[in-house]
Amino acid sequence: MIDPVYSAAPDRYHGGMKYRRAGKSGILLPEISLGLWHNFGDVDTLSGSKEKIHHAFDKGITYIDLANNYGPSYGSAEETFGQIMKKSLAPYRDELFISTKAGHDMWEGPYGIWNSRKHLMASIDQSLKRMNLEYVDIF
């Protein structure tokens, strides 16, 4: 079955979502963010995840929060989001504020553990690949 083309709601910024300035950065973030912890891994279907993300975006929720270990299996939330990003949200990338985190043991050996520079650099590279992104807004 071919997915219908997603077109964001034209009134997504006029539906009542409030935005607040984040610290001294000047960036405006919605009062509600969408955290993709346990609900966007291999337990949920891609279509169910896509429906939830599209609905949130259509309501003005533009801040998506992930981490390298989110999902029932590590990295699966980022992978699922990456598929959705590639298939339907890519035209809206500049309207999205995407964050991800590292800090969990993700692979064997001395370099896959907590917060060494090597671990963090490898973690962001892997996260970007899983999400089909060139950058994130906060890491």
Please report, for each region that a protein language model flagged, where it lies by residue:
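Structural motif corresponding to the early beta-alpha repeats
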Residues: 88-117
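Generic beta-strand or strand-like secondary-structure segments
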Residues: 80-84, 97, 101, 119-126
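Glycine/proline-rich, positively charged
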Residues: 58, 107-139
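N-terminal binding-site loop/beta-alpha segment at the start of enzyme catalytic domains
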Residues: 1-96, 134
